[in-house]
């Protein structure tokens, strides 16, 4: 268990269980397997829907999230409210980019060999990400 203490007065805030290495490996393998099968990819409209729900939940629990952040960080509540608002805005920014993350056309026709050719980039996920 990871014990989280308040930096303000060192009281125990919460105990959080660690994942065992095998559990982590299984989770990563499952995530990679799902990722490699393109039919499992979530379309942009659904990702937007999920992120909008995240914003809704965060906004409804804004005070609780701020109190938890203040307690864990040992900082004033007013600073934690700013932190929570910044996190909510970060999700909103992600939503705004979800529909426009497309590729670009690359100018061609600048040499004889590139005449009548089309080149473009596409943006797509490259794999599983792990974060702590």
Locate predicted features:
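N-terminal Rossmann-like NAD(P)+-binding subdomain of aldehyde/semialdehyde dehydrogenases
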Residues: 1-117
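Substrate-binding/gating loop at the entrance of the active-site cleft, primarily
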Residues: 110-132
């Amino acid at each position: 268990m990871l014990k989280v203490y308040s930096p303000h007065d060192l009281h125990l805030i919460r105990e959080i269980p660690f994942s065992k290495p095998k559990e982590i490996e299984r989770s990563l393998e499952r995530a990679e397997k799902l990722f490699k099968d393109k039919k499992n990819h979530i379309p942009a409209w659904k990702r937007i829907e999920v992120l909008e729900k995240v914003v809704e939940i965060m906004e409804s629990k804004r005070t609780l999230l701020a109190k938890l952040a203040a307690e864990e960080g040992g900082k004033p509540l007013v600073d934690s409210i700013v932190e929570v608002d910044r996190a909510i805005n970060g999700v909103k920014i992600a939503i705004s980019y979800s529909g426009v993350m497309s590729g670009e056309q690359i100018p061609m026709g600048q040499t004889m060999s590139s005449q009548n050719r089309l080149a473009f980039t596409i943006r797509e996920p490259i794999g599983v990400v792990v974060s702590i």
